[in-house]
């Protein structure tokens, strides 16, 4: 692993709130327009040169709407174009230059799927830690089993020094139970992007997660 020096990454909000994870500029823009303030652009399996313009545009949108825009995986481009933050999976930690990310002043989020990965993430002192997957999910092939609400609550209690984000199979119907665990952020993918009325669902999620009125 490309170890980082023994100091914390840039801080972010303790409660990141509703945290959609989307794969296009179109989704970034439409969600920021209706009040989302934390969002991740997750484009997978493309060469950096093929995603650079989208990353530039996403970062500009983040600034326009004063939002926390995280770039998944493409940490070099995130540094180059001064993103708010980067999100890395466990496999990315082995190859990313964590010191370069830290020295650039970017926030860092790390995915975890069990207690071993959680302890590893905590040692790196990231800006936030993602805990998952909570429920079965079809968005991403997962080698691990769903952790469930009880495990999530335990992990949140063990991670009180860090902002936490729950992810994985979280639907509109389940989000209140997730929030009740004390987790500070709720990441969703298909609950928004596959909704028949994405705008209504997003506004309702903002109400349930952040207390923002939906009308």
From Swiss-Prot:
It comes from the Bacteria. Keywords: Magnesium, Metal-binding, Thiamine biosynthesis, Transferase. It holds the Pfam family TMP-TENI. Its cofactor is Mg(2+). It catalyses: 2-[(2R,5Z)-2-carboxy-4-methylthiazol-5(2H)-ylidene]ethyl phosphate + 4-amino-2-methyl-5-(diphosphooxymethyl)pyrimidine + 2 H(+) = thiamine phosphate + CO2 + diphosphate; 2-(2-carboxy-4-methylthiazol-5-yl)ethyl phosphate + 4-amino-2-methyl-5-(diphosphooxymethyl)pyrimidine + 2 H(+) = thiamine phosphate + CO2 + diphosphate; 4-methyl-5-(2-phosphooxyethyl)-thiazole + 4-amino-2-methyl-5-(diphosphooxymethyl)pyrimidine + H(+) = thiamine phosphate + diphosphate. The keyword Nucleotide-binding does not apply. The keyword Mitochondrion does not apply. Binds 1 Mg(2+) ion per subunit. 2-[(2R,5Z)-2-carboxy-4-methylthiazol-5(2H)-ylidene]ethyl phosphate binds at residues 137-139, 169, 189-190. Mg(2+) binds at residues 73, 92. GO terms for biological process: thiamine biosynthetic process; thiamine diphosphate biosynthetic process. 4-amino-2-methyl-5-(diphosphooxymethyl)pyrimidine binds at residues 40-44, 72, 111, 140. GO terms for molecular function: magnesium ion binding; thiamine-phosphate diphosphorylase activity. Its EC number is 2.5.1.3. GO terms for cellular component: cytoplasm. Pathway: Cofactor biosynthesis; thiamine diphosphate biosynthesis; thiamine phosphate from 4-amino-2-methyl-5-diphosphomethylpyrimidine and 4-methyl-5-(2-phosphoethyl)-thiazole: step 1/1. Belongs to the thiamine-phosphate synthase family. NCBIfam families: PRK03512.1, thiE. Condenses 4-methyl-5-(beta-hydroxyethyl)thiazole monophosphate (THZ-P) and 2-methyl-4-amino-5-hydroxymethyl pyrimidine pyrophosphate (HMP-PP) to form thiamine monophosphate (TMP). This is Thiamine-phosphate synthase. It comes from Proteus mirabilis (strain HI4320). The lineage of its organism: Bacteria, Pseudomonadati, Pseudomonadota, Gammaproteobacteria, Enterobacterales. The gene is thiE.
């Amino acid at each position: 692993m490309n170890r980082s020096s023994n100091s914390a990454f840039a801080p972010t909000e303790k409660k990141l709130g509703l945290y959609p994870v989307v794969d296009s500029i179109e989704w970034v823009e439409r969600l920021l327009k209706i009040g989302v303030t934390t969002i991740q652009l997750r484009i997978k399996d493309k060469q950096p040169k093929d995603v650079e313009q989208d990353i530039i545009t996403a970062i500009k949108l983040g600034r326009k709407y004063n939002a926390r825009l995280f770039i998944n995986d493409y940490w070099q481009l995130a540094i180059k174009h001064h993103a708010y933050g980067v999100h890395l999976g466990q496999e990315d930690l082995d190859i990313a230059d964590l010191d370069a990310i830290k020295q650039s002043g970017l926030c860092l989020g790390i995915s975890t799927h069990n207690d071993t990965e959680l302890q590893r993430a905590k040692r790196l002192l990231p800006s936030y830690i993602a805990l998952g997957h909570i429920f079965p999910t079809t968005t991403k092939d997962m080698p691990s089993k769903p952790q469930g609400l009880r495990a999530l609550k335990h992990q949140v209690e063990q991670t009180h020094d860090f902002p936490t984000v729950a992810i994985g199979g979280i639907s509109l119907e389940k989000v209140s139970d997730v929030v009740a665990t004390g987790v500070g952020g709720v990441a969703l993918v298909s609950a928004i992007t596959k909704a028949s009325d994405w705008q209504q669902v997003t506004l309702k999620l903002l109400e349930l997660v952040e207390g923002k009125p939906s009308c």
